[in-house]
């Protein structure tokens, strides 16, 4: 079982801007996929985001990194903006 750590900006900026039905869907995906087998359910990112991974939840993307038994989440945003925001947060 993996431990989940959220970045400050995820809690302060990303989550408040997500509608409630999507929050529930994202929370379910984190609990069902990232806490159990994140390397199986996610895909690695390339180029400047190498070393990070993404999990797709509908129109949203969760950008994170696996460090031993910890999953550190850096960004949860709509797919249209997530890749512009991510380099500033890592």
Q: Which residues are covered by each model-predicted region?
A:
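Structural motif
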Residues: 57-58, 67
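A short, compositionally biased N-terminal segment around positions ~18-40 that is enriched
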Residues: 20-37, 75
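A short, surface-exposed loop/turn module that caps and links secondary-structure elements
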Residues: 31-56, 84
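Enriched for short, Lys/Arg-rich terminal
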Residues: 4-5, 65-90
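Arg/Lys-rich, positively charged N-terminal/basic patches that mediate binding to nucleic acids
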Residues: 1-28
């Amino acid at each position: 079982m993996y431990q989940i750590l959220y970045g400050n900006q995820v809690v302060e900026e990303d989550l408040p801007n997500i509608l409630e039905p999507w929050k529930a869907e994202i929370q379910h995906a984190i609990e069902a996929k990232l806490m159990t087998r994140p390397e199986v359910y996610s895909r690695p990112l390339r180029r400047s985001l190498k070393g990070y991974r993404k999990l797709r939840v509908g129109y949203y993307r969760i950008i994170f990194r696996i460090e031993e038994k910890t999953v550190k989440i850096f960004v949860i945003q709509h797919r249209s903006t997530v890749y512009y925001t991510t380099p500033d947060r890592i």
